[in-house]
Amino acid sequence: VDTSKIISTSPVNLTVQNIYGGNNQGGNTKTTNINLTGGVYQNLFGGGNMAQTDNTNVTVNGITMTGKFYGGGNQADVNYSTNVDFISSSIEEDLFGGGNLGRVEGNTKVYISASTIKGSAYAGGNGTTAVVSGNTTLSIDKASLINKHVFGGGNAANTGEKDNTKSISTLNIAGATINGNVYGGANTAILYGKTIVNIGYNQTDYNQTDITIGGTVFGGGEANASGNPNYDYSFISVTEGITINIDANNYKNFNIYGSIFGSGNASSTKGYSYINISNYGTFNNYKENISIQRTDKVTIKNSSIHLSGTTDRTNEYSTTKFSISRVKELKLANDSTLFLDNGTNLLEKFTSLKITGSQEEVATVSINDKKVTRNVNNRVYMLENK
């Protein structure tokens, strides 16, 4: 089959159990196109049921789903790429850009807008055989609600290949309430490449609305299965590097209530890790976070953040709280302020700067005839004896 089309426009009382864009148990469909407006559906697969497809395209608007959504096939490969637009719709369980126990040999691209996901959203696939060989992109805007977590990778499904570590996972969050955590990587799987997490960062291509993240932002993946007590960070969830960009410019409400990790949760990266925070809080209206941890470089510009601190069971002092932990370099710039309830652990370098474009100028202060002159006003406040 060259091209398959499934179209539903404003159906009345339409209820469908399973939708497949491709064939059933055999054959190959080159391109699948699913366009649904309205209706109630249990499970949806952009690809086939145990039957390969080349490319899948799924656009839904105003639908209700009671099961799960897959951009790929069910136990069936997609030979090239998947493309998903999930708009003004709701789903009771999880949404995946990839397949269920089926590979995607190219890329996955998922756009969630003005929608409700009562489970988690994954850019990748579901299950150990649901590898995405190329890149993954997940973009969320327009006051979407994700009740659980957001992953730039899959669920127990790798992204990229061990012998070709060039995959890129990109998360773009322009407007959403996410009650759980944000992960640049996968859930209990490896991303062979690098992750880029953009939260409110130059999201001009999307509809900006308030951003609320109830949990923690991890540049990497979730290493531990539920109930696993092992948190030694020996698992490598991202092989080539992590970048987190947080920019609250032009947002009225923008809050992250957990910590910010340049690693995964109980997982690490072999490459460099960067956290860039801009326009996040003011001196009189600072942002509340728990900690900043496990990264090579943190750059904070024009921001004010209160860090309450937390423990790290892998530290020698495992019951001691730290506001900043295992950060190789901290750059505080452009009139930024940190309020630290607890101290720092293994912070190797700290600089106070004025940054203009790519130019960095070390903070200076002069006192002349009782007049104080600064080129920048960065501050760090710590509780006594901390």
Which stretches of residues belong to each language-model region?
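Surface-exposed loop/turn motifs in large extracellular/passenger domains
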Residues: 1-18, 23-43, 49-68, 74-94, ...
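Outer-membrane translocation/initiation segment of Type V secreted surface proteins
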Residues: 368, 372-386
